[in-house]
Regions:
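Extracytoplasmic mature domains of secreted or surface-exposed proteins
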Residues: 22-442
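A composition/secondary-structure signal for short, hydrophobic, low-basic-content segments
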Residues: 18-20, 50, 448, 510
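Hydrophobic alpha-helix-in-membranes signature
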Residues: 18, 189-191, 451-453
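Bacterial Sec-dependent N-terminal signal peptides
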Residues: 1-25
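C-terminal outer-membrane/trafficking sorting elements
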Residues: 443-451, 455-532
């Protein structure tokens, strides 16, 4: 096995630098705003829902804030890589957006052109509609998108008092906008939905039925998708929860074909429902691993409302991966209120899960929780204490809903800093993290070999796998946040037998990427480090 070196140590050796003592992985990073965190009040009902890391490593913190009249405004804040406020963005670092009524933003994504696409819900107190807002890099609205930068769209089956909500957003290879969430059926039961819009924000009525893909639901209960990802072959995987009864749920994972129909090769006719054994299991976020497996994190609750964090791994076909964790599951019960909100897969295969741990509100005896695992689901003992870190924000409770990973592997978490008088402010914190970068050996049928690695933007890469590269093989490059950066077929590239040769995009930003090749039911991948 090739020796793996940490990125930072490797750079120090190349530069002839003196040895540097690495801070404890999982601890607050004191180089970020000197304390490791930022607390930013807008009003007293603030909450961050999403973190985006730009190519220049500036950080976008996105959520909403309730004003004095309890009306929600969408808020976007931008910070420099060192944690200080970026005064060049919006109004001294903060941009606020309102529509006719409430504007609740739950997710966001950066487009290949550097635009900031926000997704959520607008509420006029009788009905709710899908909300999309697209911003320019400086925080101004992109007036070419939708109606002056805004899309408000009803997608439900009821014509009055409908409830349409977008909880996550992704972009497919064509730049189409794919959102997931929930929408009322004709009986006012929330359905889990995936919907697709054109890059300009127009509902794509050729997708699913009138632009909406869903599954059958029970006559009672609530159902929603909370996370969505696009596979390299264009298929859509969404996770969330399915209402078995009016009060209790099971974890839900569904795969759709590119046209919005259910994929019968996945689970039971496209659907997987998973129950850990408690009365309530819900998926909050999902990520794909390099071999196409699906990781879903969320919660598992007992009938007495003890909440535990849950991480489950499914095979590419939707079966529980019994080799992961304990029979396919990692279960974390640190307190009475453990909630996993976000996942990230590191370039070395490690898994980071973040959320909240402690006692449930209204107390403030809860805070940041970060877990790190090996690729097999065992705790990474180098992280925190026994694989878990519980950083403390003095005098505040902390609820974590968002996570991002910077190019150096450091972990950003965001959400709410809560006072003892129940005032909530925007919170952004950065945690130390240690990870390895290396070219994996070609072993078995899971890995690819890439040279050179590290590379620079516009480098010519050679990628080798263990099979003959077919002309219809799909080559895809993903950023650390899961964003599809580049895709092409091998037929348009130089290739010979088991190798393809191609050039990286000239405007590719420094960072960590995953390079994948998919053909004839197989997927090979490798981590790639791009430097200046």
């Amino acid at each position: 096995m090739k020796t793996r070196y940490s990125l930072f140590a490797g750079l120090c050796l190349m530069l002839g630098a003196a040895p540097v003592v690495q801070a404890q992985p999982g601890s607050l990073d004191p180089t970020f705003n000197t304390t490791g965190y930022q607390i930013q009040p807008v009003n007293t009902g603030d909450g961050a829902q999403k973190i985006l890391v730009q190519d220049d490593q500036k950080v976008l913190l996105i959520g909403f804030s309730f004003d004095a009249n309890y009306v929600a405004h969408t808020i976007v804040k931008r910070f420099l890589p060192d944690g200080s406020v970026d005064a060049a963005f919006g109004d001294n670092g903060t941009a606020s957006y309102v529509v006719s009524f409430e504007a609740d933003t739950y997710s966001a994504i950066l487009t290949p052109a550097g635009k900031i696409l926000l997704a959520g819900t607008t509420d006029d107190y009788q009905s709710q509609q899908i909300l999309l807002i697209q911003l320019n890099e400086d925080g101004s609205k992109d007036l070419a998108f939708g109606d002056q930068g805004v899309v408000v769209q009803s997608i439900g089956l009821v014509t009055e008092n409908g409830h349409d909500n977008a909880y996550d957003v992704a972009l497919d290879a064509a730049g189409n906008i794919v959102i997931c969430g929930s929408s009322y059926d004709e009986n006012f039961v929330p359905r889990p939905i995936v919907s697709r819009f054109s890059p300009a924000g127009v509902l794509d009525t050729t997708f699913g039925v009138d632009g909406v893909a869903t599954i059958p639901v029970n006559a009672v209960g609530s159902n929603a998708f909370k996370g969505v990802v696009i596979q390299p072959d264009g298929k859509i995987v969404a996770s969330g929860y399915f209402g078995n009864t009016e009060l209790w749920y099971v974890m839900l994972v569904v795969r759709f074909n590119t046209d919005g129909t259910l994929d019968p090769s996945f689970g039971d006719a496209g659907i997987v429902k998973y129950n850990y054994s408690n009365v309530d299991d819900e998926g909050e976020d999902l990520k794909l691993t390099p071999d196409g497996s699906i990781l879903v994190c969320g919660i598992s609750a007992t009938a007495s409302y003890n909440y535990s964090a849950l991480l489950v791994k499914f095979s590419p076909a939707g079966a529980l991966d019994l080799s992961f964790g304990s029979e396919g599951v990692v279960f974390e019960d640190l307190g009475t209120f453990d909630f996993a909100s976000n996942l990230a897969v590191m370039p070395d295969g490690g898994i980071v899960m973040t959320g909240t741990s402690g006692s449930a509100p209204p107390s403030i005896n809860f805070g940041i929780a970060a877990w790190k695992y090996t690729a097999s689901g065992t705790p990474d003992m180098t992280f925190g204490t026994g694989g878990v870190s519980l950083p403390v924000i003095p005098t505040y409770g902390a609820m974590i809903y968002a996570m991002g990973v910077q190019a150096d592997g450091k972990i950003l978490v965001g959400g709410q800093a809560r006072t003892s008088s129940n005032q909530n402010y925007f919170l952004l914190a950065r945690l130390e993290n240690d990870f390895s970068i290396g070219v994996p050996e070609l072993s078995g049928n899971t890995a690819a070999m890439v040279f050179p690695n590290p590379a620079t933007a516009s480098s010519t890469l050679s990628m080798q796998i263990s099979e003959t590269v077919q002309p219809d093989a799909q080559i895809s490059l993903y950023a650390a946040d899961g964003r599809l950066v580049f895709t092409s077929q091998a037929g348009g590239m130089q290739r010979d037998a088991q190798r393809i040769i191609f050039q990286l995009p000239v405007d590719l930003a420094p960072g960590i990427y995953q390079l994948a090749i998919q053909q004839q039911g197989t997927r090979r991948s490798a981590s790639l480090l791009v430097t200046h």
